[in-house]
């Protein structure tokens, strides 16, 4: 499935719009605790472990969004937007959301 942040796909005609699709994932507080405990792997101001968890959360949200689009019969998602937001009473969890428009493009 083609996934893009742009509202069109150059050289392709959109033949059907299905509407908004989304995928979400939440990283719990225990993950943050584990990450901060391993803060020793920071190199140049970056934490490789933290970045890997964020990358996995993003990938999960995108996969859920694509699965929802596939169920509708779409073969692409356009206008994709990723959002990161803290949730929970003390902001102890991070939610990653992927949103876009499910479409069918010509082959």
From Swiss-Prot:
It comes from the Bacteria. InterPro entries: UPF0145_dom_sf, UPF0145_YbjQ-like. Coiled coil: none annotated. Belongs to the UPF0145 family. This is UPF0145 protein BT_3410. The lineage of its organism: Bacteria, Pseudomonadati, Bacteroidota, Bacteroidia, Bacteroidales.
